[in-house]
A protein has these predicted regions:
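Core catalytic alpha/beta fold that binds nucleotide/phospho-ligands
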Residues: 1-150
């Protein structure tokens, strides 16, 4: 796998089923195991998703919003986020000094970046400067915005 790959699913699909289907779609048949692990407390009930395909570690990320679930898999750390295109949040919680972009778009970019870093929302979004990061906007269903980061 040379680059990241993104796949959309119905949000009623479980995370494990979506990640397994995505891995098999990209990597072919094989034994797939997945779960979550919280780096802060060690719980497997929440935290960053993980996936193994035939005993090979694959970097994964997923996000749900409304009726949509998006997964990303890659050979290196990856983050993906999808949100409704209108969010109700204070700009100072999302925007770094000098940033003026649409809040929902900025939120998805920054959450994808924080997922790729492995910190998630434990890092304040206002500390992330988009100009210093690697991300791309993804095509999303009408009424939604999505982003991918590495």
């Amino acid at each position: 796998m040379e680059t990241e790959h993104v796949l959309w699913h119905d949000a009623s699909t479980s995370a494990a089923a979506a990640l397994a289907a995505h891995a098999r779609y990209v990597l072919g048949p094989g034994a797939v195991s997945s779960g979550r692990l919280c780096p802060a407390c060690g719980s497997d009930g929440h935290g960053r998703p993980w996936l193994r395909h035939d005993d090979r570690r694959i970097h994964v990320s997923l996000s749900r919003s409304g009726i949509h679930l998006v997964t990303a898999i890659a050979a290196r750390p990856v983050g993906v986020d999808v949100e409704v295109s209108v969010i109700d949040v204070l700009p100072e919680l999302v925007l770094a000094p000098g940033e003026t972009d649409d809040l929902a778009t900025t939120w998805t970019r920054k959450e994808a970046i924080l997922k790729a870093r492995g910190t998630g929302l434990t890092t304040p979004m206002s500390c992330v400067v988009l100009a210093e990061e690697r991300w791309q906007d993804l095509p999303a269903p009408p009424g939604y915005v999505a982003a991918l980061a590495e």
